[in-house]
Amino acid sequence: MSDSGLLALQPWIRELILGSETLSSPRTGQLLKVLQDSETPGPSSAPDTPDTGAVLLVSDGTHSVRCVVTRNAIDTSDWEEKELGFRGTEGRLLLLQACGLRVQVAQDHAPAEFYLQVDRFNLLPTEQPRIQVTGCNQDSDVQRKLNECLEDHLSESASSSAGLTLSQLLDEVREDQDHRGALVCLAKSCLVLKGPCTTTPLTDWITSGSQALGKAVFTVSGSLLHIPEGEEQILSSTGSSQKARGTSASPSHMPLEESGASVSLLSALATSDPGQMDSSQSPPAVGSTSPRAQAPTSPPCNSTPSSLLLNCSPSLSPLHPAPRSHQSCETRAQAPKLEFQCSFKKRQLLPRTSAQELCSVWEPPERHRDTSAFQYKYETPSASLHTQVQTARLSPQLVAWALNIVMESESELTQV
């Protein structure tokens, strides 16, 4: 400060950098003149951190240096135009209240340099004329000091990074292995691993059944369809003798042959008296080829018993080698291979059953199961009785009960 009472700048930045063994703070009350505001480009740049409020280029009258003003310093200052920033403050003086010297390490395009960090200041209204100054970081002594500081910084960084003990290194390796194992378990849980097939192999029967697409396939061996010559002659002679007699018969049930052959069946319905033959007899039904011989459908029951229960023996014609599919259809349609006719001798050879215990020639039973006598001939009712029957009204319950009794008797007769 001069004798006229005006504020005067004195050089102190270079001496602070070169004289400080440890980068200490300058004395309180030092003056700096603002050369450029934060928006004015300069030869170098100070670090830009979140706490940075403004970056200025300041001078002590001899050397210039970068000055970083923190955000907290701007907020706590009494500067009235702080909302407008440092634009237009060139030539004004900064009164430093809290300041420190820092080193900027070279990174990206920013060179290494010394700079000042201002934590508290006061902007004076006094303006100083512009004077040509040199950059403090361009001085040779300052460059030498900067290199020494950078070497010390690098050595401290290397020693701090190389200070891991063996136990710390093992802990790092263990944590890395645990992390890797967790990643492997997570990857396995996300994958669907398919191991070797342990299922039992399919049999030929299951394989052929799956290839049949759900259709039932039946196979009959050719040996089962062959009839020995002796049996063939007996059956042929029996059939020819029965045909000569002109006897027509139809069995209600046919037992399965021991050979298990699958042949066409010829069935006919028989009536009890010749008078009802033409009206109640149904045409013969031809059965289709199947693995097992099926029993013909029992004829419907009339008011009087009309079914003939016969013991029959099959009459078979000689079988030739198995025809083709279209030939087998024509054979079934043209000539049946098996006819059921009455044979008393054949009935004696087969095991006796309840149906075969009846006589070969059907005779009307004399008594009911309850030992009451059958009555086949009835007198003509009188006219008065006929009129009474017509005028009688039966209740629905009684009609249903009678119908149930009739149906039960018909089912029992059919089963026999």
From Swiss-Prot:
Compositionally biased spans, kind Polar residues: 234-251, 273-292
Entry's Gene Ontology BP terms: embryonic limb morphogenesis; establishment of protein localization to telomere; intracellular protein transport; negative regulation of telomere maintenance via telomerase; positive regulation of telomere maintenance; protection from non-homologous end joining at telomere; regulation of establishment of protein localization to telomere; segmentation
Q: Where in the cell is it found?
A: Nucleus; Chromosome, Telomere
Span of the annotated motif PWI: 11-13
Q: In which tissues is it expressed?
A: Ubiquitous.
Under the heading InterPro entries, the entry gives: ACD, TPP1/Est3
- Regions of biased composition (Low complexity) lie at 259-272
Q: Which GO terms describe its molecular function?
A: DNA polymerase binding; protein-containing complex binding; telomerase inhibitor activity; telomeric DNA binding
Cross-link Glycyl lysine isopeptide (Lys-Gly) (interchain with G-Cter in SUMO2) - where?
A: 345
Q: Which PANTHER family match?
A: ADRENOCORTICAL DYSPLASIA PROTEIN ACD, ADRENOCORTICAL DYSPLASIA PROTEIN HOMOLOG
Assembly and partners? Component of the shelterin complex (telosome) composed of TERF1, TERF2, TINF2, TERF2IP ACD and POT1. Forms heterodimers with POT1. Identified in a complex with POT1 and single-stranded telomeric DNA. Interacts with STN1 and TINF2.
Q: What does this protein do?
A: Component of the shelterin complex (telosome) that is involved in the regulation of telomere length and protection. Shelterin associates with arrays of double-stranded TTAGGG repeats added by telomerase and protects chromosome ends. Without its protective activity, telomeres are no longer hidden from the DNA damage surveillance and chromosome ends are inappropriately processed by DNA repair pathways. Promotes binding of POT1 to single-stranded telomeric DNA. Modulates the inhibitory effects of POT1 on telomere elongation.
What further fact does the record state?
A: Adrenocortical dysplasia mouse was initially reported as a model of human congenital adrenal hypoplasia (AHC).
Protein name listed in UniProt = Adrenocortical dysplasia protein
